[in-house]
UniProtKB/Swiss-Prot annotation:
This is Serine hydroxymethyltransferase. Keywords: Amino-acid biosynthesis, Cytoplasm, One-carbon metabolism, Pyridoxal phosphate, Transferase. Catalyzes the reversible interconversion of serine and glycine with a modified folate serving as the one-carbon carrier. Also exhibits a pteridine-independent aldolase activity toward beta-hydroxyamino acids, producing glycine and aldehydes, via a retro-aldol mechanism. It comes from Aeropyrum pernix (strain ATCC 700893 / DSM 11879 / JCM 9820 / NBRC 100138 / K1). Pfam families: SHMT. GO terms for cellular component: cytoplasm.
């Protein structure tokens, strides 16, 4: 990176503008984004995001704040919680966590003290880093006991997991996570953890939009005591966290600690954008979630047909938005992800169940998600095209720069955000609109 002349502030501003614009063009117009943990907001939600709320605080709970000037965010936060909860079958909702990790931490800390045990899948079996001794769980001093995992079926080994829970008697267990292509056995694990006096947390960060759209089982209906999540993956809103509760006592305990333990300012500007996205999900969520899961299966089939080793063939490859590919024979996850990035196809390298944790920098697999390209209007035909482009890079060893040009042409057809309110007559003045009127 070329050094900036720090004595010339204008040159720094121009460089900042250049880098930001180049990123926007690259990721929004020229790339196929297949990162499983990302998505794009609608233009309508984006307008709601660009508000004066980004400058403001609202410590505490709605209508019981420690700051004045919160009359509108109070109403919006309650409304958003009702919208989100209505799609999860609960009115016990916390939207103040600013990320999925903070959502997890807020529940973990209430359920366990340092030295207590929790049964959770290891990170190479799909757990999020916040579930591990390397992340939030370890920072809280909670001991991770690895949940038995069935590598062949890419899922929890139910019989062994139940036996372990009965032996260990942990304070809580966690299902869900960062890589999972099939629903976890929520009922069975809930029964086991409840029998020893513990609680079940389901990390639905990746599948929240699929649950709301009816394409994934609702963990609250299957015994989970709390469902944590983020609002920017299959739920296509702004970055943020959320917790949904079945257990009212747990809700009250966690809610009391969100402020001041975990957040002071909970980033108010994301709340109206989350509300707009929730309305979009109520209107279009079933069609969207159905197309996402259908696209994922089609992409998996197409990749396999092109010669890639897609995990889960005997079970239909996937029921989520994710496709997992074993690329050991193609140079490993780090090399493959890098080659695809050079080709403007964005995926991430990922540990697979047989990898040791220390292989995190060069794991066996790549993880692919189709939720964003689905929102751009892509369907089965486009999944076949994407599979061909990936084959050109990883198997045929074509020049990534040439493939990148093909990707740019391909993306020109998909610039509109679907399953959104963008084609409705919804007027939302952004903060820039308001300020320009005052000039």
């Amino acid at each position: 990176m070329k050094e900036l002349d720090l004595s010339d502030p204008l040159s720094m501003v121009l460089k900042i503008a250049e880098l930001t614009t180049r990123h926007n063009v690259w990721r929004l117009r020229e790339s196929i984004n297949l990162i499983a943990s990302e998505n794009v907001m609608s233009l309508t939600a984006l307008k709601a995001y660009l508000s004066d709320f980004m400058f403001r605080y609202a410590e505490g709970k709605p209508f019981k704040r420690y700051y004045q000037g919160t009359r509108y965010i109070d109403e919006l936060e309650v409304l958003t919680g009702e919208l989100m909860g209505s799609m999860m079958g609960t009115n016990l909702v916390e939207l103040r966590p600013v990320s999925g990790t903070i959502a997890n931490a807020s529940v973990f800390r209430v359920l366990a003290e340092p030295g207590d045990k929790a049964v959770i899948a290891p990170v190479q079996a799909g757990a999020h880093v916040s579930h591990t001794k390397f992340g939030t769980l370890g920072a809280l001093g909670i001991e991770q006991v690895s949940m038995p995992y069935d590598e062949e079926n890419m899922n929890v080994d139910v019989d062994k997991a139940v036996k372990l829970i009965e032996e260990v008697k942990p304070r809580f267990a966690v299902l869900g996570g960062s890589v999972y292509i099939f629903p976890h056995p929520t009922r069975e694990i809930a029964e086991a953890i409840h029998s020893v006096g513990g609680k079940l947390i389901y990390d639905a960060a990746h599948v929240l939009g699929l649950i709301m759209g009816g394409a994934w089982p609702n963990p609250l209906e299957r015994g989970a005591d709390a469902v944590t999540g983020s609002t920017h993956k299959t739920f296509p809103g702004p970055q943020g966290g959320a917790v949904f509760f079945r257990d009212e006592q747990l809700y009250k305990k966690v809610s009391k600690t969100i402020f001041p333990w975990w957040v002071s300012n909970h980033h108010l500007h994301r709340i109206p954008a989350t509300a707009i996205t929730a309305v979009e999900m109520k209107l279009y969520g079933r069609d969207y979630a159905s197309q996402v899961t259908s696209n994922a299966r089609k992409l998996a089939e197409a990749l396999a047909a092109e010669g890639l080793k897609v995990i889960g063939e005997h079970l239909g490859y996937t029921r989520s938005h994710q496709v997992v590919v074993d690329v050991r024979d193609l140079g490993g996850g780090a090399k493959c992800a890098s080659l695809l990035e050079e080709s403007n196809i964005i995926v991430n390298k990922n540990l697979l169940p047989w990898d040791p944790p220390e292989a995190v920098k060069d794991p066996s697999g790549i993880r692919i998600g189709v939720q964003e390209v689905t929102r751009l209007g892509m369907k089965h035909g486009e999944m076949e095209e994407i599979a061909k482009l990936i084959r050109k890079v990883l198997i045929d060893k074509e020049d990534p720069k040439k493939v990148a040009e093909q990707v740019k042409e391909f993306r020109k057809q998909f610039m509109k955000i679907h399953y959104s309110l963008d084609d409705k007559d919804v007027r939302i003045d952004t903060i820039a609109d308001i300020l320009s009127l005052a000039q």
